[in-house]
Amino acid sequence: MKVKYIKKTNVSLTEAKTYDVMSVEKGSYRIVDDTGEDYLFQPEDFEIIEK
């Protein structure tokens, strides 16, 4: 799944940038952020671009 980050407050993600969701775990998205590390993020911070 591809998602676009729609918030401004996270230093490891870029506003309006598209990210690939590696997996969905307990309702959160596992995404590789701009530092190259993967973390869990809240779905409400993203807009789904492609399922």
Where do the protein language model's features map onto the residues?
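Basic/aromatic-rich interaction segments and small domains that mediate binding to polyanionic partners
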Residues: K2-D45, I49-E50
